[in-house]
Amino acid sequence: MMMDEQKRIRIDRMRYTKNKTSSNLALLAIVLNVLYFVSVYESDVGSWYYSLLIGASIVYNLLFMLMAFLASEGVKNYKIGYAYLLLGIGAGQIARIFILPLQALHATVTISKVTYPVMQTGQFVYVVACLCLSALCCICGGVIGVRRSRTLAAYQAMLEK
């Protein structure tokens, strides 16, 4: 009996408090994404990075940061749609590993008859770690947001009966 009462109080408190956990995870995902793109964009290996792929990557980074920030504000107020958005952009972060970083790892450029790797293994591991951690933050924030939003919605529906 006591545990049920404590659980109801905890759920009732959700009506008046913000979902800071999901929100903070989304903001951390943005920080990790910034570390990723700073590492990639500061690389200067010939003209390999001067391509349409980098242009698309820059646009995606801007969209990712915008969507993640909007989602962080939305999940803070238990809006389930933004939690699903976090899940989607988390999956997008995983997919990004196989686009630019993987291509750069296997690519080489020749400058003055000397062949250089576009991305060395250490940098590849770093950028993949940033993307994976960013994805993990988005996915965890999304899962927490969905669970809490559903819990709160069910409780509010029960109160309306």
Where do the protein language model's features map onto the residues?
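Loop-to-transmembrane helix junctions at the membrane interface
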Residues: 64-101
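Cytosolic juxtamembrane helix and N-cap/initiation of the first transmembrane helix
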Residues: 1-36
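Residues within membrane-spanning alpha-helices of integral membrane proteins
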Residues: 23-30, 54-61, 83-93, 127-131, ...
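Cytosolic juxtamembrane helix at the C-terminal end of the final transmembrane segment
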Residues: 65-78, 135-161
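Alpha-helical membrane-associated segments of multi-pass integral membrane proteins
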Residues: 19-29, 33, 109-152
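Juxtamembrane loop-transmembrane helix junctions in multi-pass integral membrane proteins
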Residues: 7-21, 44-48, 70-81, 114-125
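Interfacial non-cytosolic loop connecting adjacent transmembrane helices
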Residues: 43-51, 96-129
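Transmembrane alpha-helix entry/boundary detector in multi-pass membrane proteins
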Residues: 18-25, 36-63, 122-125
